[in-house]
Amino acid sequence: MASRDPSERSPLLGGRSEPPVPAGSVFSGRGLACAAVLLSELLERVAFYGITSNLVLFLNGQIFGWEGTQASQALLLFMGITYLVSPFAGWLADALLGRFYVILGSMVLYLLGMLLFPMVSYSGTRTAFCGDIQWAQIENCSRSNASSDDTCPEPSRRYCAPALFLGLIIVGLGVGSVKANITPFGADQVKDRGPEATRRFFNWFYWSINLGAIISLGGVAYVQQNVEFLIGYIIPAVCIGVSFLVFLCGKTVFVTKPADGSAFTDMVKILAYFCCSRKHTRENTRNIQNNQHRHKQSRLDMAKASHGGPFREDKVEDVKALVKIIPVFLALIPYWTVYFQMQTTYVLQSLHLRIPQIFNNNHTLPAAWLTMFDAVLILILIPLKDKLVDPFLKKRGLLPSPLKRIAVGMFFVMCSVLAAGILESERLEIVKRDKIQQQIGNVTYYAANLTVWWQLPQYILIGISEIFASIAGLEFAYSAAPKSMQSVIMGLFFFFSGIGSFVGSGLLALVSIPQIGWMSNHSDLGNINGCTLNYYFFLLAAVQAATLLLFLIISVKYERQQSKTYRRL
């Protein structure tokens, strides 16, 4: 039976056959297309971080009055949705619409969801979406002059939850669809220039992501916390609108390809055949053994037409490549669980540390600015990595593989959450004897008299982990993908990231139940002074440490398999 070109199944990076391209010419003739992709992604990230950077503060404020754990869970659920939708968006692009039109349509959906947040921020339209707030008497409200007659929103009820979750879901669907397709779409612009061009594109793609994060965290988050959330949500809505226009105008210079069928559908059929045909395993395995030469074949080979199955050789080989990659993605779940703490529990911790005033006595340092240090570090280090470190290591044959870089990233993210746990232990001791009140976003927080700058180590460590794990993860997902499964495998990479976010939300809910009680404190909305958040951080560090050991085993096994494959080519 005829099959496709073998290059359709070979990895896109790291192959032996592609001629080297001079470093100065890798983007020649494709600069405008790459610039349009990078600018669109930059603006999209401004919009994304405009939602996520202060969502905990927004929901925990006076208007909505959600508890700190409830606000953190909402953000973790939102992050999970944005990543879980990625494989399905990849399938839609491959099977029906093509990447360009899926990205374009996703940005429209993104914009519709973004428009809901200014509407619920504005008092004139909030009631139409949320109804009237229900008030109930509780004790110990977050006010310095609280009395038994004071009323606050009932902590068990989340005001405006249906409208807010609807907006988060719509935005999440848009974000996830863009995320799954814009990365491989951007790489498509330079993939014919060789692996060096693709590697450098991913470096600059990630650089653009973090520049967008800095713009959003530095400007939008400041406006939200110190000026008004209404203006702070209009800005990201405008940014996603401009991103849509930039991407639309780039159609004339983009390298695009039409939908040519989804390998995701073939993958499901082949795996279903394999699982439902186990009764034929012995006979097919015997046939495989008779046809073996020098290397061991997979049991999935029984699905091939040459072994009595109904599927083409190349399609089965694609699925075999996917099966080898899945364990790596599974091992990354705890990494993402820790990574997403940066915008949730890390922010809760910062709200209960002493935050300095800036510019005037009415403006305070935005809690989200700590996240900006992570992005600034990446902006500085990625160009150094791209221009100096990587070429230096490559000339000497010392450039680590993507899997080795991911392992290093896991180590640094473990150190980050461990540092957060140590800081939280110290904060809980200090707040007992030296408590201060501070006004943040029109809400009074009771904080330890310990400067928020002590959080810098955990943010720096998580930034270093991104340079190793996140960039290498994107590169691995793209390089390990046969050409027919680029969007599928890239989507699965983000899918497992979403699972990591849901795991974090689930763990937070678990440690909040009264039987455990680490985060069970309903007496003060958003207050973590009566909680043991440090235990949660130490739990995450322990899980990541165990997973790092498992990942090292998986990565060594995978690289050995790849080495054998290259020797056979």
From Swiss-Prot:
Gene3D superfamilies named among the record's database cross-references: MFS general substrate transporter like domains
Region annotation (Disordered) maps to 1-20
What's a Pfam family in this record?
A: PTR2
What GO terms describe the biological role, i.e. biological process, of this protein? Answer: dipeptide import across plasma membrane; innate immune response; mast cell homeostasis; peptidoglycan transport; positive regulation of innate immune response; positive regulation of nucleotide-binding oligomerization domain containing 1 signaling pathway; positive regulation of nucleotide-binding oligomerization domain containing 2 signaling pathway; positive regulation of toll-like receptor 7 signaling pathway
Membrane-protein topology: Multi-pass membrane protein
Tell me the GO molecular function terms.
dipeptide transmembrane transporter activity; L-histidine transmembrane transporter activity; peptide:proton symporter activity; peptidoglycan transmembrane transporter activity
Q: Main subcellular localization, coarse class? A: membrane
Q: For this protein, what reaction is catalysed?
A: glycylglycylglycine(out) + n H(+)(out) = glycylglycylglycine(in) + n H(+)(in); N-acetyl-D-muramoyl-L-alanyl-D-isoglutamine(out) + n H(+)(out) = N-acetyl-D-muramoyl-L-alanyl-D-isoglutamine(in) + n H(+)(in); L-alanyl-gamma-D-glutamyl-meso-2,6-diaminopimelate(out) + n H(+)(out) = L-alanyl-gamma-D-glutamyl-meso-2,6-diaminopimelate(in) + n H(+)(in); carnosine(out) + n H(+)(out) = carnosine(in) + n H(+)(in)
Name the domain of life this protein comes from: Eukaryota
Record's Gene Ontology CC terms?
Answer: early endosome membrane; endolysosome membrane; lysosomal membrane; membrane
Q: Which UniProt keywords apply?
A: Endosome, Immunity, Innate immunity, Lysosome, Membrane, Peptide transport, Phosphoprotein, Protein transport, Symport, Transmembrane, Transmembrane helix, Transport
Q: Which InterPro entries match?
A: MFS_trans_sf, POT_fam, PTR2_symporter_CS
Q: What is its subcellular localisation?
A: Lysosome membrane; Endosome membrane; Early endosome membrane
Spell out the SUPFAM superfamilies in the cross-references: MFS general substrate transporter
Q: Where are the transmembrane segments?
A: 46-66, 73-93, 100-120, 160-180, 201-221, 229-249, 322-342, 364-384, 406-426, 460-480, 488-508, 536-556
Q: PANTHER family from the entry? A: OLIGOPEPTIDE TRANSPORTER-RELATED
Describe the family membership recorded for this protein in Swiss-Prot or TrEMBL: Belongs to the major facilitator superfamily. Proton-dependent oligopeptide transporter (POT/PTR) (TC 2.A.17) family.
Function description: Proton-coupled amino-acid transporter that mediates the transmembrane transport of L-histidine and some di- and tripeptides from inside the lysosome to the cytosol, and plays a key role in innate immune response. Able to transport a variety of di- and tripeptides, including carnosine and some peptidoglycans. Transporter activity is pH-dependent and maximized in the acidic lysosomal environment.
Q: What is this protein called?
A: Solute carrier family 15 member 4
State the species of origin: Xenopus laevis (African clawed frog)
Q: Which lineage?
A: Eukaryota, Metazoa, Chordata, Craniata, Vertebrata
